[in-house]
Amino acid sequence: MLNFRAKCTTYSLEEYTRYSKHLILPQIKLEGQERLKQSSILCVGAGGLGSPALIYLAASGIGKIGIVDNDIIDISNLQRQILYTVNDIGLSKAYIAKKKILEINPTCNVQIFNTRLQSINAIEIIRQYDIIIDGTDNFGSRYIISDSCLELNKIHIYGAIFQFEGQVSTFNYQGGPKYRDFHNNIETENNPEDTCSNAGVLGLLPGIIGTLQATEAIKIILGYKSVLSGIILKYNAMTISFEKFKIIHTQFILSQPKKKIKSLLVGNSSYPVQEIDVIELQNELYRNSFKYIILDVRSKEEYEESHLDKAVNLPIKDMKKRYYSDLNLQDKISFIYCSVDSRSIFAYNFLRKQEFKVIRVKGGLSSWTNIIGNEKLYVKSC
């Protein structure tokens, strides 16, 4: 329970009317509403998950809300990021999110951080809030949030979406598991943590998962005991079903991290990343002075749509099955790419663990098409 000594605050007639449906609930009443008003929540990411979470947190009467996001609104966001409209395209997500929140609840104190959460700023930002809602979609950001919350003793409410499935959990709650405990226990093939742009997502799915994250935050503030600590709640939109899975602890969860995240990490099996940009890759391919193989670690469907010339498709889900054994990777250098970065980081660490010579291509196929164009690029004809 947060704000267990919440002081009685003065409510206007408008506020009594606004929160009247809360005030008549015996589980909330005036005391619970005061807890909400005196609490602070930081939402890292104002996209698919952040949009519904921010809307309902503001409407519920959270007193202070922080938003971390440096993205610009794109038309492709509108399918799932319900805070934004066509009139907002090209504008800052953080700025527009604040504007919309204040339209919902003008009494809310909204702070925006128009930046990306990184190891150099995470502690300073996160320390200002009681609860952190994780609306990110990549390994690095989630580990930074997890480690910062552990250091500052903050609650980390995790959410993730992939195609038609989503999951929610609460980490670092009263000595419970953290994100690293969960991530180190799930199957590689189910955990490339692809972004929506990489793998697609049903538009309404983040609305469900983001709302569940906001619900967890409110329950914690009000002191409810039925929190998703040590449990992953998984939702399948195709079958309209929920499942719960227990998280197995992999280490003493209260131990502080030896150092903050300063590089790309995957679980506890990380390596100094050897990487090149697409210009350097192009030059290496022209020289052709050593034995190499280009590995496209995206899905088969993405590979068939477009891929680099002579690239071999090795989806992440197939790595656990050792489908790479016929490629003789031990005899050559492997250049790895995906759509942007997230899956190639995962693949890099996995193959390095097998002691293969691996180089990651920064920015992936997206960077290649933006900088180099269609040269040495196969694109499926219509």
UniProtKB/Swiss-Prot annotation:
Single GO term (MF): sulfotransferase activity
Record Gene3D superfamilies: NAD(P)-binding Rossmann-like Domain, Rhodanese-like domain
Keyword Magnesium attributed: no
Database matches in SUPFAM superfamilies: Activating enzymes of the ubiquitin-like proteins
Subcellular location: Plastid, Chloroplast
Alphabetical UniProt keywords: ATP-binding, Chloroplast, Molybdenum cofactor biosynthesis, Nucleotide-binding, Nucleotidyltransferase, Plastid, Transferase
Pathway: Cofactor biosynthesis; molybdopterin biosynthesis
Rhodanese domain boundaries: 288-377
Catalytic reaction annotation: [molybdopterin-synthase sulfur-carrier protein]-C-terminal Gly-Gly + ATP + H(+) = [molybdopterin-synthase sulfur-carrier protein]-C-terminal Gly-Gly-AMP + diphosphate
TM region positions: none
CDD domains named in the record: RHOD, ThiF_MoeB_HesA_family
Single GO biological process annotation from the record: Mo-molybdopterin cofactor biosynthetic process
Task of the protein: Catalyzes the adenylation by ATP of the carboxyl group of the C-terminal glycine of sulfur carrier protein moaD.
PANTHER family: ADENYLYLTRANSFERASE AND SULFURTRANSFERASE MOCS3, UBIQUITIN-ACTIVATING ENZYME E1
Family label: Belongs to the HesA/MoeB/ThiF family.
Name of the protein in its database record: Probable molybdopterin-synthase adenylyltransferase
Organism: Porphyra purpurea
Organism placement in taxonomy: Eukaryota, Rhodophyta, Bangiophyceae, Bangiales, Bangiaceae
Encoding gene per record: moeB
